[in-house]
Amino acid sequence: MKIANTFIKRGAAGGLDLSQAPGVTLTLAERRRSRQRLDLDEGRGELGMAIERGQTLRDGDVLVAEDGTYVVVRAALEDVARVTAATPWQLARAAYHLGNRHVLLEIAERHLQFEYDAVLIDMLAQLGGVTATRLRAVFEPDVGAYGGGHRHGHDESFGDDYALAQAAYHAHEAHPHAHFHAGGHGHVHSGHGHGGKHGEHDAES
């Protein structure tokens, strides 16, 4: 079985002769995996894929096998919800609420798309001014700078992300904090061990 360990982005594949190249149709979940065995379209064989982790293949990208063979990636049709709105503001508001729920979201000029979810459809219906339609379509969400949507504990980079978050937290805790009270006065202290100082300070003021 041939192995593809790299790929060419669709924007850079324009000069390639792909007229005889086999294709492989993949869902979004499959396009986000870095290592897997693929069945080529039209029964044209198998391909092992072992590309760099954290990559998401897009419709029109070209996998390159070790022997130079090209395989064209085709995005499968998926069950999605397409959101339209009466105004750009209402569409942006829908995107905001979906983003708060860590939804993988495809953002186009006049619509949004996400994997169909009846609960999210009900949530959008309560916003007003937006329409969500269920359909089969190619789904290519904006995966952002980190290559994915909501990250969980089993994600490959979770350890690094958690360490960074912990470092930021401890740096914040070590910095003096200013507290302001309703009486218009303020004071600075380090950490959160207040002891009896607040009561004495307030009594004097």
Curated annotation (Swiss-Prot):
Protein location: Cytoplasm
InterPro entries: UreE, UreE_C_dom, UreE_N, UreE_N_sf
SUPFAM superfamilies in the cross-refs: Urease metallochaperone UreE, C-terminal domain, Urease metallochaperone UreE, N-terminal domain
Keywords: Chaperone, Cytoplasm, Nickel, Nickel insertion
Keyword Cytoplasm (UniProt): yes
Pfam family, one: UreE_C
Protein name: Urease accessory protein UreE
Originating organism: Bordetella pertussis (strain Tohama I / ATCC BAA-589 / NCTC 13251)
Gene designation: ureE
